[in-house]
Amino acid sequence: MNNIVLAVLQGVVVMAVAPFFSGLGRVIRAKMHNRRGPSIMQDYRDLAKLFARPESQSEDASFALRIMPPLFFAVAFMLAMGLPLFTAQSPIPVFGDAITIMYSLALARFFFALCGVDSSNAYAGIGGVRELLMSVLIEPSMLLALFATALVCGSTDIATMGQHIMTGAVDAPVAVILAGIAFAIACYMELGKLPFDQAEAEQELQEGPLAELSGPSLAMAKLAMSMKQVLVVAWFCAIFVPWGEPATVGAAAVLGAVIFLVKCLIDFVVCGVIENSCSRSRFKVLGNQTWAVVGIAVLAFVFVVVGV
């Protein structure tokens, strides 16, 4: 029972703080550009306005357009319940498995891209193609890094992997370090940060598939995208930066929640500084910039085989 309560609490907290962290990136960008910029609470206001507006959809819209926002949000909330965020143990272990997480994110990405490709809007189609391209570039390095770490730790469970790294019970520490570097870069790409993308871009870039959405559906999709960013950061921290989380469920989970939020705050600030020190690249040439990440992940896998 305690695990179920903790799982729901994790989902609610991630949903509540996701707009804050997405707004934090915009504030950092404005400060580094020496301009005033929006308030850090602007994303909350935008979501409130969208939820209050009536929804408008084409009569010819397919099931993909209708099902994508609730599906995307459900996947994000499910992963928030399963990841070991506030404690070192996963509240729902079946949702905290690396393979489950990868396939869940792939499912959400597939419907997100399908929503754009299915539309007759040209910008939405470009956005859908962009999502599929980013999937091809990011997922191989993520999978290789995760499998290398899973082989060292003997499990694909996120909590177990984090415990092995926290206690130093790994037979190939160099491989784990390389896998962590590759996974960190892949997570940065997944966040949609410069130079790979711009998370607040307009319809012809990241938010292309949202061009045909409006009202509550658009708000739900935007909230799910913000939750996904927090979950990607939490995913990295749960495996490679697991220190500070309490071992059991209970009152100590409150301290674990504070530590989790501090980790997310530090990560988002670092990502914001890095992002605003780069210039954006065309998404069609991103493959030239991701070979190094795949190479690091492959090298980590090789080091696991030789036991280094």
Can you annotate each of these PLM segments?
Residues 25-54:
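Membrane-interface amphipathic/juxtamembrane segments adjacent to transmembrane helices
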Residues 6-17, 93-106, 168-190, 253-256:
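Alpha-helical transmembrane segments
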Residues 270-297:
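Interfacial loop-to-transmembrane junctions
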Residues 91, 148-176:
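Juxtamembrane/interfacial segments at transmembrane-helix boundaries in multi-pass membrane proteins
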Residues 46-64, 122-126, 209, 213-217:
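Cytosolic juxtamembrane amphipathic/interface segments immediately preceding
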